[in-house]
């Protein structure tokens, strides 16, 4: 099912620039924590709340791209071309099944970007420069970071206002978080002094297990008020939705997964 269609420069910039845009890097160096799931479903829920959202897929796996039904095999250009070939990002922006959500897609081509960025003088600030002219036309920009702390992730840290960190309620949940926070502090000192944590999101929570409850308590102790009150549960419909190229809010809007992301969107909006 293919929803993506090129939107174009004039459509993106239709209307007046918004007064304030929040750029959030959705990040965790561990894979399988619900990062792409969160980008897809939080963006959809924000869109349904009448917020204009741009998602930037910075993960070569392209799960956020396919999660919105965009056929990666049919794409001639992607975020790689904006980062390394000076391709205008406004010409990469695609429509999605949610009218208020737009996507800059990624394909496996992006896997080579880490090596190619090394040779650039401005290698850590390319994404920030690319987003500069269009960010103000959206309420939120959500960046799906790769599960690593390489140059693509550093670019996301520099471009972002704040970080949204998903942590799964499973064994070794906090493994690697210390390293992520060290990277954040380095970027904050050198390149992005205002960078901070917007929120920490508990995912894959199963209230039936002692482990989930213990991990939730541990994360709460570690991050305090940064932890969102809304927790994302383990949910079959949430797992099924990507194979249909739909956010769970459209695939199964009455499911627990859909309700959780809808409530999370409200909490995100309240935080400003």
Give the residues covered by each predicted segment:
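P-loop NTP-binding core
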Residues: 1-272
């Amino acid at each position: 099912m293919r929803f993506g269609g090129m939107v174009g420069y004039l459509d993106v910039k239709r209307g007046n620039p918004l007064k304030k845009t929040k750029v959030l890097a959705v990040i965790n160096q561990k894979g399988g924590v619900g990062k792409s799931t969160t980008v897809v479903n939080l963006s959809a829920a924000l869109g349904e709340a009448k917020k204009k959202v741009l998602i930037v897929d910075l993960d070569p796996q392209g799960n956020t791209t396919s999660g919105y039904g965009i056929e990666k095999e049919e794409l001639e250009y992607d975020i790689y071309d904006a980062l390394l070939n000076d391709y205008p990002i406004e010409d990469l922006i695609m429509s999605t099944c949610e009218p208020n959500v737009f996507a800059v897609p990624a394909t496996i081509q992006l896997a080579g970007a880490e090596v190619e960025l090394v040779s650039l003088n401005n290698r850590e600030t390319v994404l920030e420069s690319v987003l500069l002219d269009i960010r103000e036309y959206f309420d939120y920009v959500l960046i799906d970071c790769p599960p690593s702390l390489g140059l693509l992730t550093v670019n996301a840290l520099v471009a972002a206002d704040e970080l949204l960190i998903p942590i799964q309620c499973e064994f070794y949940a906090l493994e690697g978080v210390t390293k992520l926070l060290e990277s954040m502090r380095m970027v904050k000192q050198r390149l992005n002094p205002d960078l901070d944590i917007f929120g920490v999101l508990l995912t894959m929570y199963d209230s039936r297990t002692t482990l989930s409850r213990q991990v939730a308590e541990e994360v709460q102790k570690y991050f305090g008020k940064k932890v969102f009150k809304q927790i994302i549960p383990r949910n079959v419909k949430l797992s099924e939705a990507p194979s249909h190229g739909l956010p769970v809010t459209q695939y199964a809007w009455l499911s627990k997964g859909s309700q959780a992301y809808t409530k999370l969107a409200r909490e995100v909006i309240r935080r400003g």
